[in-house]
Curated annotation (Swiss-Prot):
It comes from Mycoplasma pneumoniae (strain ATCC 29342 / M129 / Subtype 1) (Mycoplasmoides pneumoniae). This is Uncharacterized protein MPN_586. InterPro entries: Mycoplasma_peptidase_DUF31, Peptidase_S1_PA, Peptidase_S1_PA_chymotrypsin. Belongs to the MG067/MG068/MG395 family.
Length: 347
């Protein structure tokens, strides 16, 4: 019986069509093959990437998730002067909102040895970690903008290895064009490729001394201050919403799309970028937030990309309801209004 898995990523990677999912974990080689066959010492550890037997597909993308656009005449202004407008009649020249959040759907098949390894060594540990965090809807933080400064933060992503380790690419395929309109996926002659590039195992290693328990630095309104523009399905998009800035989170390439967790064991947002003279500040887009007063919503309204609210036109719980996922089973059992908005909505 196949397994259907949903994984969060940052939307920018999704848009540039990085459809082949790499998974990463620290594995002891004896679980895969004899170390001598791949030139590694007995008991050595490595950073492993494997390709799923089927190409992942997009389950959810956070675009057009609020009923606002940035008209062309507003787009031409200085960013601090730009004002998003309530959407009435959208023009082709208008800029639409997006958030740096997407979900991939991955099918794993038990008759595939690689899929089994992915499930056993990556998916199952992730499920166990989720259950240890509470297996609850409360795992998603829903704070007002004055609350994040009281927490410390942890990034959930690739493992941190202090020592040099090999990189193993397991069962990778290549594309070969046979005809003008046909491309086939074929296995490489070797079932694995070993590299000793030390940069791969340290994808999210901090450049500073601090690695976990980082502190809040400030709130950041992406709708007013960010110049992140993209084109998607013939439309222009600019990032929209609230972000928090975390100190000493200057992580290297590959860490974008990781979950940011606070010290209350709650998911706060998606890590997506850096800033500062030495890239010492890390940015994470909030998935949910509450406004305490109208002034906090003057640049971007309080949205909820997970459970939805009156301001959010597109959110993940709509997909969860349609496909009857584990998340929606929890929503359906809940009587807490902050989680149940989707129950009375048509999907």
């Amino acid at each position: 019986m196949r397994q259907t898995i949903y994984l969060t990523v940052n939307l920018m990677q999704n848009w540039v069509e990085r459809w082949i999912l790499d998974w990463a974990n620290i594995l002891t080689w004896k679980t895969l093959c004899h170390q001598t066959k791949i030139g590694l010492p007995n008991g050595a550890q490595a950073f492993v990437s494997a390709q799923t037997s089927t190409i992942p597909k997009t389950a959810f993308t956070a675009h057009d998730f609020v009923d606002y656009t940035l008209p062309q005449e507003q787009k031409g202004k200085e960013q601090k002067e730009q004002q998003w407008m309530k959407n009435s009649q959208t023009k082709d020249t208008d800029v639409h909102p997006y958030a740096d959040f997407a979900v991939l759907e991955i099918l794993l098949f038990p008759d595939s040895s690689t899929d089994r390894k992915i499930f056993n060594h990556f998916i199952q540990p992730a499920i166990r970690a989720y259950k240890q965090l509470g297996d609850s809807l409360n795992i998603f933080a829903n704070q007002t903008l004055d609350q994040p400064k009281h927490n410390r933060y942890y990034l959930l992503g690739y493992p941190f290895l202090r020592n040099k380790a090999a990189s193993l690419f397991l069962n990778q395929t290549e594309q070969r064009k046979e005809h003008m309109d046909k491309t086939t996926q074929i296995l490489h002659e070797k079932p694995f490729v070993v590299l000793t590039d030390p940069a791969k195992p340290t994808l999210i290693r901090n450049k500073g001394a601090n690695f976990t328990g980082n502190t809040w630095t400030s709130n950041y309104d992406l709708s007013k201050k960010s110049g992140l523009y993209h084109k998607f399905l013939g439309k222009k998009y600019q990032i929209y919403g609230k972000s928090i800035v975390i100190s000493d989170l200057n992580l290297s390439s590959g860490s974008s799309g990781s979950l940011l967790l606070n010290d209350r064991k709650q998911i706060v947002g998606i890590y997506f970028g850096v800033d500062g003279p030495k890239d010492e500040l890390g940015f994470s887009q909030l998935l949910r937030w509450q406004a305490k007063n109208n002034d906090e919503e003057k640049d971007s309204v309080a949205y909820d990309l997970i459970f939805g609210n009156k301001n959010t036109t597109k959110y993940y719980a709509q997909f969860a309801k349609e496909h009857k996922t584990h998340l929606y089973e929890q929503i359906d059992r809940s009587n807490d209004q902050q989680f149940t908005f989707v129950k009375n909505q048509k999907c």
